[in-house]
Amino acid sequence: MATLLEGFEGGDTMFLARTTVELLRPVPLAPLVARVRLVRPGKKVQLVEASLWANGSPDDPAATEVVRAIGLRLRRGSADAHDLVQLAASVNADVDRRAAVQSEPGTGVLQEFEYDEGVGFGRRGFHAEAVELRFSKGAMQQQGPGTMWGRLLHPIVGTEPARGVPLAVALSDFGNAVSSVTDMDSWSFINADLTVSLHREPVGEWICLDAVTHVSNLGVGLASSALFDEKGPIGRAAATLLLEPRNP
């Protein structure tokens, strides 16, 4: 979805600063039709909407919208803000480097998966076959906050590897998995949405998530992640969770 929002007409002069994804229906393993449109035009601020449809095009009555995303695009600045960037890095140093100083891209314990017929991480899927995940703190199915470096092993759209904003958005979906508060055999955690806000362009092939998950008696949770690349902080991600006990 980030690739569609970023690449829509006029995107070369704009930065995709926020991506919000609404997961409307289960996404089938079948061809999908994409639609992208400009919701709010502007020279400095734009809103772009992208949607994915199953069983036909958006104009087909039989088609079903399965995913919708809104992208906030801001005009790329032409002024030299080097001094401001350096000042911000200095005053925020203690906070910004909390996770990044603990490890470097490509280091940490490799997350491996054993396949079975169960639920969650025991199944084959994107988490096990499309990404490389390395933990400097925590692990999948280890309860509590976690810090993880991840990279994509395969292209998402076309043949080119995902980089920049699309890479950060794709890996931000792992916030809850990095910081789960219980095991997936007992509870299901459904990501109802995902919002990723970035203050600069990510660089390199690795993205770091420093994540924590909070839950309530309402059966609602929130997975929050501080995002980093090899040069430091790039933004934050948040996913709203629906919690349900699994059938015994």
Placement of each model-derived feature along the sequence:
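Terminal targeting signals and extreme-terminal segments of soluble enzymes
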Residues: 1-248
